């Protein structure tokens, strides 16, 4: 029996795939547990429509990420973060990804998840720092962060 997988099934198929499986397995496990549906004309059309919608959404997300990367590449695109520091220019604490994301949202109206910032360790010094930001699976941008005395 040909079925269209609605979700990934280990060892059998991935979501959206159309495969031939034994009748008993299809009826008693896959269809019963809503992991697959029979590959009829109506179901195939629905799967194709879902795949097109997913591809369109992925393309839009990629285009949006590319646009944001271009905006961040501008020299004037700098996020200002203030911190207390000593005489030698070292901070009394550190600037974390959370502080950078909050400043980015306040100053540039761009909301990002703090896990998107690929900062190995918090910033401990005054001055400019380039922070890599993973905007999309295929798009990584550099965000300039200026830490100043505050």
UniProtKB/Swiss-Prot annotation:
<keyword id="KW-0694">RNA-binding</keyword>
<dbReference type="InterPro" id="IPR000244">
    <property type="entry name" value="Ribosomal_bL9"/>
</dbReference>
<keyword id="KW-0689">Ribosomal protein</keyword>
<dbReference type="InterPro" id="IPR020070">
    <property type="entry name" value="Ribosomal_bL9_N"/>
</dbReference>
<dbReference type="GO" id="GO:0003735">
    <property type="term" value="F:structural constituent of ribosome"/>
</dbReference>
<keyword id="KW-0699">rRNA-binding</keyword>
<comment type="similarity">
    <text>Belongs to the bacterial ribosomal protein bL9 family.</text>
</comment>
<dbReference type="GO" id="GO:0006412">
    <property type="term" value="P:translation"/>
</dbReference>
<dbReference type="InterPro" id="IPR036935">
    <property type="entry name" value="Ribosomal_bL9_N_sf"/>
</dbReference>
<dbReference type="InterPro" id="IPR036791">
    <property type="entry name" value="Ribosomal_bL9_C_sf"/>
</dbReference>
<dbReference type="Pfam" id="PF03948">
    <property type="entry name" value="Ribosomal_L9_C"/>
</dbReference>
<dbReference type="GO" id="GO:0005840">
    <property type="term" value="C:ribosome"/>
</dbReference>
<dbReference type="GO" id="GO:0019843">
    <property type="term" value="F:rRNA binding"/>
</dbReference>
<dbReference type="InterPro" id="IPR020069">
    <property type="entry name" value="Ribosomal_bL9_C"/>
</dbReference>
<dbReference type="GO" id="GO:1990904">
    <property type="term" value="C:ribonucleoprotein complex"/>
</dbReference>
<keyword id="KW-0687">Ribonucleoprotein</keyword>
<dbReference type="InterPro" id="IPR009027">
    <property type="entry name" value="Ribosomal_bL9/RNase_H1_N"/>
</dbReference>
<comment type="function">
    <text>Binds to the 23S rRNA.</text>
</comment>
<dbReference type="Pfam" id="PF01281">
    <property type="entry name" value="Ribosomal_L9_N"/>
</dbReference>
<dbReference type="InterPro" id="IPR020594">
    <property type="entry name" value="Ribosomal_bL9_bac/chp"/>
</dbReference>
<protein>
    <recommendedName>
        <fullName>Large ribosomal subunit protein bL9</fullName>
    </recommendedName>
</protein>
